[in-house]
């Protein structure tokens, strides 16, 4: 009598485990990442401390390259690509360092952009997260690039296709440096579970400093804020139309220990498009 009872218990346990696992998988499928104001992201614009950051950059940059194989390998490959169009071997000023940073960010392999974006989305969650953030130098160089480098335009329509089913706030920021394209067909080439039609006023054209120059890439910074104007829902995807409404930062000059002096703080907005 004991053996059948044991078998029954084991079978019951296996069935329940399968049900729980299936439920968890279904829950994960239904979960929709929310695009909101991304308060935990590192949105530092370095207002008022550019000179200080420039002075501290060499030692910070060297220490981070030495600490990260991914970062150092991506930088080495990016430097090689950058040198192809130069008559000198190494960057001589901040502008040229930022150009190499853009090459490194846009590389398909090694995929620095994946780890960098993921870390940037939570790097300002708290002091411990910022201390552990391994890309402070890259963040500064890309921020400098989006503010002072690249093709300048007042505002421009760009497009982005993603394989993620986002829910979105009435106002949102991407919370990371975000690649978009001037060409809608290029953006549609990527997975388009959520397709963005954006008007950006802070993004910069980086085709000349991108590893994939044919993509007509425009880089949108994490501190640019967008207002959703409409959402078109389809059976398998959605299109989100949004326009730039300026910039805001919850954090400024963290590395040098300064406080918010110049930047606009970010407010919460609760209306959601599911």
Say what each PLM segment does.
Residues 1-4, 272-274:
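A positional/structural detector of protein chain ends, strongest at the extreme C-terminus
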Residues 3-22:
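Cleavable N-terminal signal peptides of Sec/SRP-targeted secreted and luminal proteins
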Residues 5, 28-33, 118, 211, ...:
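Intrinsically disordered, low-complexity segments enriched in glycine/proline and serine/threonine
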Residues 24-45:
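Short N-terminal segments immediately surrounding and downstream of signal-peptide cleavage
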Residues 50-51, 55-204:
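Internal glycine-rich, Lys/Arg-flanked active-site/core loops of soluble domains
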Residues 168-255:
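ADP-ribosyltransferase catalytic core
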Residues 249-274:
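Intrinsically disordered, low-complexity terminal/linker regions enriched in Pro/Ser/Gly
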